[in-house]
A protein has these predicted regions:
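Signature of uroporphyrinogen-III synthase
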Residues: 1-247
Length: 247
């Protein structure tokens, strides 16, 4: 691994764990080029999330669908700031927890809890498949949503199963690096100035695409993808890149 990365120039679009990824690559001899595409922020209007927390701590939530580890951590953070953390943790312990993929499982373990129903695969379809095995009739189901995805398919499934969904969106994505920096990365990719780019989330790829489209640089972006190695962590990242014509 060290020999494979020695001297390689690798673009890192990550924001939250940027320092860790840069150190990991540099320890293996690579030159990491940071360009954080997306930052994660608490929902700008905290009141709907706080209202959801007040409902949740009443203990009337039967099931909680956790799409991401970040979602649980953001809920915990707001619970702490609103003096609801003990009640929130108590309610979590007695609520059946349904998780999509390893990240929400990891976030639960950080607070000494486990998933009760892990999805068959880390997708909405995987969650629905897992939930079909259980009678949901009459149950109250909290649903932690992802930014930009109201997930009507999951919400509709829950309603069709006779349950009542209670969605919550605890965080949002915002642009991090300015457009000029992103455009410079696109130009250098097209020119073959890098060896690889490593995506850790779908929103990173979408930001790159959006900047390219807005500036008429789609062809440069596709050329860049074809000239360098494109790495993706996680299924959603891979799917986003496939839609951008990456193999």
């Amino acid at each position: 691994m060290t020999e494979e990365l020695n001297g390689r120039r690798i673009v890192v679009p990550e924001a939250r764990e940027l320092g860790q990824l840069v150190r990991m690559l540099e320890e293996r001899g690579a030159e990491a080029i940071p360009c954080p595409m997306i930052a994660i922020r608490d929902a700008p209007d905290a009141e709907p999330v706080a209202a959801w927390l007040r409902w949740f701590v009443k203990g009337t939530c039967d099931d909680l669908v956790l799409m991401t580890g970040e979602g649980l951590r953001r809920l915990l953070g707001l619970a702490l700031r609103t003096d609801l953390e003990p009640a929130f943790l108590d309610a979590l312990r007695t609520t059946r927890k349904i998780t999509r993929g390893p990240k929400p499982v990891r976030a639960l373990r950080e607070i000494g809890l486990d998933a009760d129903i892990p999805a068959d695969e880390p997708t909405t379809d995987g969650i629905i498949t897992a939930m079909r095995r259980h009678d949901l009739s009459g149950r109250s189901v909290g649903v932690q949503l992802n930014p930009g995805n109201p997930n009507r398919r999951l919400v509709d499934f829950i309603e069709a199963a006779g349950a009542v969904p209670y969605p919550v969106l605890p965080y949002v994505y915002v642009s991090e690096a300015d457009d000029a920096r992103v455009l410079a990365i696109i130009s250098d990719m097209a020119a073959g100035q890098f060896d690889a780019i490593a995506f850790t989330s779908a929103p990173q790829a979408r930001r790159l695409r959006d900047v390219a489209r807005a500036t008429g640089r789609d062809a440069d972006l596709l050329q860049g993808f074809r000239r360098i190695v494109v790495a993706a962590v996680g299924r959603s990242s891979r799917q986003s890149l496939k839609r951008l014509a990456c193999k």
